[in-house]
Amino acid sequence: FFLLAIAAPSVVSCTGSAIGVGALSGLAAYEERSIKTIARDTKIAILLHSALLNKSKKHFMQIGIEVFEGRVLLTGGVESAQMRADAVGTAWKVENVTAVLNEMAIGLNSLVDTARDAFITAQLTSKITLDKEIMAINYSIETVAGTVYLIGIAQNTVELEKVIAHARTLSYVRKIISHVRIKEIE
């Protein structure tokens, strides 16, 4: 767990992973995942980033990684089908991975597209965070080439529909793909 405390802030593309360990326990009251699951997801992200970096710096720089409940969402543009297959294979080799959601496209994004995508993600994150009817902490967002990818846990279908509605209001959003699951009623 000490390794996670040191390494978690260095994982830039994993929104949930960038939270420090101290903040982790405070946020756990709002987060649908347990602290153990958050730590496991963080570890998966760190190990996958490391494996991709060791394999190729291109892999590391071009592939976005989000991990939620052991489900790994891979996004970004890669140069070839082989590069995409290698990334998926690498993800499956990481311990505790339960699913790999391959949303990588063949073809690289321009610097303008990358900046625009980051802006879309920031805008959507802000909108859902400020919406009192959405538990934003339970969502991770990636945007690639104008496509918004969502992963996480919605409290109900109404909440998920609100998140998607917020995404639809943003300029340059071409498509929204949801890998969000609806919370099970206990």
Predicted regions: what they are:
Residues 12-186:
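N-terminal targeting leaders
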Residues 1-16:
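Sec-dependent bacterial lipoprotein signal peptides
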